[in-house]
Amino acid sequence: MGGGRLPPLWLPLLIAWSEWGNCCLDAPPVVRSPCLQPVRDRNRERNPGSPQLLPYGDRLEVACIFPAHDWPEVSIRVHLCYWPEIVRSLVVDARSGQVLHNDASCYIAGGRWRFEDGGAAQRLSLSFRLITETAGTYTCVLGNETHSLATETTALVADVHDLRHSDRSCDLAFGSRSQTRYLWTPDPSRLRSINCGWEGERHRVVHYIPGTSGLLPSCEEDERELCVPFISQSIADNNCSRRHRVDGARRRYHLRRDYWLTDPKIGLLAAGSVALTSLCHLLCYWCSESYRRLNTEEENEAAEETAAGEASAVAAAAVSEEEQQRE
């Protein structure tokens, strides 16, 4: 060895351990790496669809599959809910498989990464335990010498804190299928809740999916700016608000079908309309009868006058004949 100093015996083990992404003692960050630059214009990060609520504490894997050797760099970009202003990145050279930058796996609970070259396609994966501190968005990013391209974004939620008012009783319902912008879970029947007590006039309930690790979410909630849009959009369309809309539609339907029993004012208005119509009909009938009676009386008087005139004429003719006979 030429009298040189031998490397420590633990260095190969450390290097092997680092290759699997369990330590952040990797190569220094490549500041000029396109995958570390903000994704702008038409290549900006895509809005994540269908945030998923998965079993709390279970290990899961986020995998990005890329065309082989089409892009020199591949990356997984991480935005955690608790630290949305901090971006963690795992950047790998797609040609050599060497890590260029990694501040993601060591800051994520149980984080491990792996890069696989399958010939036609390459696969970069990041596995970790899903807990409150690891919830967030995981974006697959491609990079070359000029720009970067976000291909897919996965949003993961570990638990949901629901503050309920005392005058409302709502059951938060999650769907079993992916719906854009709304939180969903593959198995809604496994949904459980933790009663965290009262905060003023509101009741805090934490919803989660039990995992095999036995870990439970905490009732203490810090500021989670990144996860708030996912959760609030889901709660805005939850079972409670749907029930209110259905009840309102049902009330309007019964109002149209049976307004007599539903609203006394509408019944009184209808009765008044019927009474007014009947009165108008009676007045019209009285007027028509009066007019007919008046016409009948006039006709009778005219007939009597005609008959009297004829009788007078006959009498006058008879008198004139008698006078002629006497002469």
UniProtKB/Swiss-Prot annotation:
Major subcellular site: host cell
Membrane topology: Single-pass membrane protein
Span list, region Disordered: 297-327
Low complexity bias locations: 305-319
Keyword Transmembrane helix: yes
Domain of life: Viruses
Name of protein: Uncharacterized protein UL14
Organism from which the protein derives: Human cytomegalovirus (strain Merlin) (HHV-5)
